[in-house]
C-alpha cells in the first residue's frame, strides 16, 4: 500500500496531471474515475491506483485485479487526484500513437480539424460531439491544448479512447 505523497509513483502521477512536458516525454497520461477506468482499453493501461476505501467494492476490485495495481491510502489518493472530489480510482495509460492513415484510411472519412483550441473543457466536449456526429478522426494543430490534459480527458467522457487523433504542424 502506498502511504506517502513522497512515494515516487505519487510524485510522477502529480507531474503527469500537471505538466504537458511530463506526459509527452513519458508517453503517458492519467484518467480518473470509474467511467474513464471502465472504458479504457486494457492494452493502454500501465497501472491502476485505487483508494483504500474503494477496495471494499468487490465488483470494481475484480476488474482492477486483472491489471497491475496499487492501493493508496485515502489521504494520499486525494493528493494524487486532479479533481476536487476524487472517485477513488485512476489509471495511468499509455498515450496511443496514430498516423494520418488511421484517420483518413476508412471509407468516406469525416475528419474534424481543430486549430489553436486552448480551453481543455471545450476541447473534450468538441471531441465527444465529434464522435456523436460520426467523425472518423481529429487533426489538431500543435498550438491546441494537450489532448491528454486531465480536464480534456474527463470532458471527453471516453471519446478519446475511440477516436484517433493526430497533431499536425498546420492545417493548410
Model-derived regions, located:
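Structural motif
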Residues: 30, 49, 90-92, 111-113, ...
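Short acidic-hydrophobic, aromatic-tinged amphipathic segments that line or gate anion-handling sites
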Residues: 1-4, 70-73, 164-171
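Acidic/glycine-rich phosphate/pyrophosphate-binding loops and surrounding catalytic core
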Residues: 84, 88-108, 144
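Short, aromatic/basic amphipathic alpha-helical patches
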Residues: 56-66
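A short acidic, often aromatic-flanked loop/helix-cap motif at beta-alpha or helix-coil junctions
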Residues: 56, 74-80, 170-172
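Glycine/small-residue-rich loop that forms an oxyanion/phosphate-binding "nest" at active or ligand-binding sites
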Residues: 64-94
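Boundary-proximal intrinsically disordered activation/regulatory segments immediately upstream
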Residues: 1-58, 144-145
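RNA substrate-binding interface of SAM-dependent RNA methyltransferases
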Residues: 103-172
Amino acid at each position: 500500500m502506498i502511504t506517502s505523497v513522497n512515494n515516487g509513483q505519487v510524485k510522477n502521477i502529480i507531474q503527469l496531471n500537471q505538466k504537458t512536458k511530463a506526459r509527452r516525454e513519458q508517453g503517458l497520461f492519467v484518467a480518473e474515475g470509474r467511467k474513464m477506468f471502465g472504458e479504457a482499453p486494457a492494452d493502454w493501461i500501465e497501472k491502476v491506483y485505487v483508494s483504500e476505501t474503494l477496495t471494499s467494492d468487490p465488483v470494481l476490485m475484480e476488474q482492477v485485479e486483472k491489471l497491475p495495481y496499487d492501493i493508496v491510502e485515502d489521504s494520499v489518493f486525494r493528493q494524487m487526484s486532479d479533481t476536487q472530489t476524487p472517485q477513488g480510482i485512476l489509471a495511468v495509460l499509455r498515450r496511443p500513437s496514430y498516423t494520418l492513415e488511421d484517420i483518413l484510411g476508412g471509407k468516406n472519412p469525416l475528419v474534424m480539424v481543430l486549430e489553436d483550441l486552448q480551453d481543455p473543457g471545450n476541447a473534450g466536449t468538441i471531441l465527444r460531439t465529434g464522435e456523436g456526429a460520426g467523425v472518423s478522426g481529429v487533426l489538431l494543430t500543435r498550438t491546441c491544448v494537450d489532448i491528454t490534459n486531465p480536464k480534456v480527458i474527463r470532458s471527453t467522457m471516453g471519446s478519446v479512447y475511440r477516436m484517433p487523433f493526430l497533431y499536425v504542424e498546420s492545417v493548410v
